[in-house]
Amino acid sequence: MNPMRKIMIDKIVLNCGAVEKKLERAIKLLQYVTGATPKKTLAKKRIPAFDIRPGLEIGCKVTIRGKKAVELLKKLLTEELEEKQFGPGFANFPVHEYIQIPSLKYQSEIGIMGFDVCVSLKRAGFSICKRKRKKSKIPARHKISKEETIQFMKENFDIKILTKGEEI
């Protein structure tokens, strides 16, 4: 296989939405799961129905890259994921309760909470669209398709993909 076509994990973003008192618990949860310090996320728009205004802290997130991201993903993945949780170059899935993760124990100061996991994939050469000088687009033949994303996850993490109509 051409080394430039090899797919790798770019980053994993763990995200937990919460307001006020629950936000502090969400920060502790993400710190407990990853060992990294989470960043608070702020609302951009006003949504009166949910009592949200611009600048209000509405959640937290943490980004993990490199070898630590691969190790964390192996811990977080369940045996089965749905096909609709995959896209071209990414995969998203929820962790409903952190106590479902085998290596983590219940923490009374956190309680029962869950979070979302977003996995971004890349190939060698993807940095050409992010650099400051001589930026260029990634050609369509080099982009990662949904099918390639599913195949990568099957091969590297031994998961089963459920299609529409099958149950978890």
Task: Show where each model-derived region lies.
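Ribosome-associated RNA-binding proteins
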Residues: 1-168
